[in-house]
């Protein structure tokens, strides 16, 4: 069963404080029968849109509405080296319709460089074959430079990353990484993994675009559908039969 664990943290980038809400979803795909296991996650994302919309429509609106909308989904792929699981394809299809999705290969150090590149290529093909929308995608308002940058990132997807909370001393220098049989994996060395490229993409070059895309594409689509449904429900004529039943 999918659970939701929310962690709020503050990071500092170039002297600017950035508050992040991180939502983990332990339990996804862990059951024997995983049919419709994506529904709680999809519902959670839509619920955050609903909360924001209700606050937006209140008579006395807050000056700064607390924003709990999900601006990006980091979808971690098991480093099997083979292909996406059917459950992952279904999940990505559902998520790609309602939020920015960035696919990531987790624990990429378990693959050789050749295996990693072959796996990335297969995943990109599967995303395309299944018409799965992942971030970044081109927009008609983008200029040539923005389109070129997007093309470079799209060719790199899914990001192959290695994570670690440990810092080692290597030749007198602190190195965040993982110790393996082949030696030290430095997660901030671009020749070892793509963590640095992913971090820069997520928190520096594309942070504001992720927020804008959520607001003007996904949330606006949700908002329009909700307001249209509200308008249609309020405009429905009252059934004459229903009125007669109440009169009697």
Label every PLM stretch briefly:
Residues 1-99, 112-134, 138-141, 145, ...:
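Switch- and interface-adjacent substructures of P-loop NTPase systems
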Residues 107-109:
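Short beta-alpha junction loops
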Residues 17, 67, 176-179, 242:
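Intrinsically disordered, low-complexity sequence elements enriched in Ser/Thr/Gly/Pro
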Residues 157-186, 194-197:
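Conserved P-loop NTPase
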Residues 232-240:
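C-terminal regions of RecA-like/P-loop NTPase motor modules
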Residues 100-105:
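Short hydrophobic alpha-helical runs that function as membrane-insertion/retention elements
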